[in-house]
Amino acid sequence: MNPKRKQRLIIVSFLVIGVSATVGLIMAALSSNVNHFYNPTEVAQGAAPVDKSIRVGGMVVDGSVSRDGQSLAVAFTVTDYNSNVDVKYTGILPDLFREGQGIVATGKLDAQGVFQAEEVLAKHDEKYMPPEVQRALDKAQDAAPAQTY
């Protein structure tokens, strides 16, 4: 192999290694900031990781909201009409938050199976539903046995 070809091969090799290292670092940085979405059924089945930042979404169960009169602590239950997840949140809830409405909460699942929310987002209006919540609700309704009233 002549010296010029050898020099080009070394340069190309270093470039490939450098680009690979850069892509690897970018992927590692992005993966630590990704919050995966889970519906209440997946959380109840144990598919959601404990003590890792995730998103949980569904409908707020009617009659489930309880507020602490001494602080901003709120507890409520989220459902996908198949399973329920208890959520605790301390902070100011969005103006559009109410029972029977869709929400997406970001936080961590504790060892007792209670979702400790750090952020709660409510849907924008009566027609809007976050896409991941809508898919989760549709999936849960398809899987649920038919109910007769």
From Swiss-Prot:
One MF term in the entry's GO annotations: heme binding
Entry keyword annotation includes Heme: yes
Alphabetical UniProt keywords: Cell inner membrane, Cell membrane, Cytochrome c-type biogenesis, Heme, Iron, Membrane, Metal-binding, Signal-anchor, Transmembrane, Transmembrane helix
Ranges of the Cytoplasmic topological domain: 1-8
Periplasmic-side segments: 30-149
InterPro entries for the chain: CcmE (IPR004329), CcmE-like_sf (IPR036127), NA-bd_OB-fold (IPR012340)
Location of this chain's protein in the cell: Cell inner membrane
Gene Ontology cellular component annotations, sorted alphabetically: plasma membrane
Membrane topology: Single-pass type II membrane protein
Top-rank lineage group of the source organism: Bacteria
Annotated TM spans: 9-29
Residues noted as binding heme in the record, renumbered to the chain: 124, 128
GO BP term (any one): cytochrome complex assembly
Function text: Heme chaperone required for the biogenesis of c-type cytochromes. Transiently binds heme delivered by CcmC and transfers the heme to apo-cytochromes in a process facilitated by CcmF and CcmH.
Protein family membership: Belongs to the CcmE/CycJ family.
Protein's recorded name: Cytochrome c-type biogenesis protein CcmE
Source organism (scientific name): Hahella chejuensis (strain KCTC 2396)
Lineage of producing organism: Bacteria, Pseudomonadati, Pseudomonadota, Gammaproteobacteria, Oceanospirillales
Gene symbol of the encoding locus: ccmE
